[in-house]
Amino acid sequence: MNLMNIEQNAENLRLLGLIVAQRGETIYQHNWDSPCRRLLFSASKSFTGAAVGFAVQEGLLRLDDRLIELFPDEAPENPSENLCRATIRDALTMCIGQSRGYLMGAQRVGMAEEDWAKAVLALPFDEAPGTHFVY
């Protein structure tokens, strides 16, 4: 891979940034645009699903692990029963227990909380996890 070629053609490729890692070490990193939140639309689901699949295969987590146990520092002080029952499987199937989508369009851009996990876990979980699909 010729990284100089990539740098020279980055504008034509419309790259925002590039990180190359080898054996767990970052060997190259360059940003062509300033860091900011980007809407990735449905691409996020593909990356997340693949990452979770690898983590399950490596024994790092299970689909039935509870979100509250994976994100204890991001959880609200008094989590609801529904939030306490929500699992990775529920998150991957978009059935974590919320009755409506809270992070669509302008809501996402205007969100004050920088920590996405903390922001999502602070939202109401008013449905039983696994029972109500919300995009």
Please place each PLM-identified region on the residue numbering:
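A short, mixed-charge helix-start or loop-turn motif at secondary-structure junctions
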Residues: 5, 32-34, 77, 124-129
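Catalytic tyrosine of NAD(P)H-dependent dehydrogenase/reductases that use a Tyr as the general acid/base
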Residues: 41, 133-135
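Active-site helix/loop module of the DD-peptidase/beta-lactamase fold
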Residues: 58-98, 122
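Short linear capping/connector segments at secondary-structure termini
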Residues: 31, 36, 66-75, 105-107
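A short, well-structured edge-of-sheet supersecondary motif
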Residues: 3-34
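Short, charged, amphipathic alpha-helices and their helix-cap/turn boundaries
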Residues: 25-26, 68, 104-128
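Active-site SXXK
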Residues: 24, 39-64, 91
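Extracellular/periplasmic catalytic domains that process cell-envelope and extracellular macromolecules
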Residues: 11-12, 82-85, 112, 126
